[in-house]
């Protein structure tokens, strides 16, 4: 079944410019709906780790993108005094008390998750936003005004602090999802975008911005890398001088590395102190 879905989605993607809500073929509609439903239940993911490496299911991402071409905007009532107008329903629109109990997570008003996102057990959603295709694994905290972008992958026991932005793949369109691995702490108002991977047990300080073009400077080695924070890194914002010394440009600085045991025993503020 999965292989058949993949074939339909890949073919539809090649012809996507021809589709609209009025003319999309039934088999394409059904295939996209099945993919979104499986994403919503967590039985299918845009990306998963295989033998230590992240594998992106590009066809699943394509299904998410196709869904926007296949649906019209509809009115979505919310209580007696508010309504919305969008293509994607909210995840919890038809939830009962039993559904919430089965899910095992908390949703604090006015947190919003879109249909097609997955929220794991013991997750706490403060007033925040989780977009379609995103996966938030068990025990994670999505703090107030944090946003988890489309198809982003959030690991177990991750803390996304207030105002954190985790980039999506839709606007602007990205090749790969942004990934935050298990046991990471992302400090307030930080932004991790453009398919950057933050590996497990890392701590990102407040106000750190990392995209694919951001230089990541390792203080211990002097090495500059891009797009990936190594496991156990403690990262703060910084600057690197230009070659002529006339100006400096923003970078992210790995100030130290910690193992999982140290990370578990040491407070976040203590780790960030130089």
From Swiss-Prot:
**Which terms does the UniProt entry file under GO BP?**
diaminopimelate biosynthetic process; lysine biosynthetic process via diaminopimelate
Q: Which GO terms describe its molecular function?
A: 2,3,4,5-tetrahydropyridine-2,6-dicarboxylate N-succinyltransferase activity; nucleotidyltransferase activity
CDD domains in alphabetical order: LbH_THP_succinylT (cd03350)
Q: What is this protein identified as?
A: 2,3,4,5-tetrahydropyridine-2,6-dicarboxylate N-succinyltransferase
Gene name in the database record = dapD
Q: Which family does it belong to?
A: Belongs to the transferase hexapeptide repeat family.
EC category: transferase
Pathway annotation:
Amino-acid biosynthesis; L-lysine biosynthesis via DAP pathway; LL-2,6-diaminopimelate from (S)-tetrahydrodipicolinate (succinylase route): step 1/3
Assign the protein's first listed, main location to one coarse class: cytoplasm
Q: What is its EC number?
A: 2.3.1.117
A GO cellular component annotated for this chain's UniProt record is: cytoplasm
Which cellular compartments is it found in?
Cytoplasm
């Amino acid at each position: 079944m999965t292989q058949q879905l993949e074939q339909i989605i890949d073919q539809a993607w090649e012809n996507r410019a021809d589709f609209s809500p009025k003319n999309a073929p039934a088999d394409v509609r059904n295939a996209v709906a099945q993919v979104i439903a499986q994403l919503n239940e967590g039985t299918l993911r845009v990306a998963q780790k295989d033998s230590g490496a992240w594998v992106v299911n590009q066809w699943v991402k394509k299904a998410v993108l196709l869904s926007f071409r296949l649906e019209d905007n509809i009115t979505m009532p919310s209580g007696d005094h508010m309504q919305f107008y969008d293509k994607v329903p909210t995840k919890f629109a038809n939830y009962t008390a039993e559904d919430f109990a089965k899910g095992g997570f908390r949703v604090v008003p006015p947190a919003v998750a879109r249909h097609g996102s997955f929220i794991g057990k013991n997750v706490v959603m403060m007033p925040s936003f989780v977009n379609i295709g995103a996966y938030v694994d068990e025990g994670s905290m999505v703090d107030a005004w944090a946003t988890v972008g489309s198809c982003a992958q959030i690991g177990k026991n991750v803390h996304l602090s207030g105002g954190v932005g985790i980039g999506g793949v839709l606007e602007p369109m990205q090749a790969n999802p942004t990934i935050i691995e298990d046991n990471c702490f992302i400090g307030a108002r930080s932004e991790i975008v453009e398919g950057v991977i933050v590996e497990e047990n890392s701590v990102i300080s407040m106000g750190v911005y990392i995209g694919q073009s951001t230089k990541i400077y390792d203080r211990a080695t002097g090495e500059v890398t891009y797009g990936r924070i190594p496991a156990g890194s403690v990262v703060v914002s910084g600057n690197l001088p230009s070659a002529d010394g006339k100006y400096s440009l923003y970078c992210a600085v790995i100030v130290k590395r910690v193992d999982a045991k140290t990370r578990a025993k040491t407070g976040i503020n203590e780790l960030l102190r130089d």
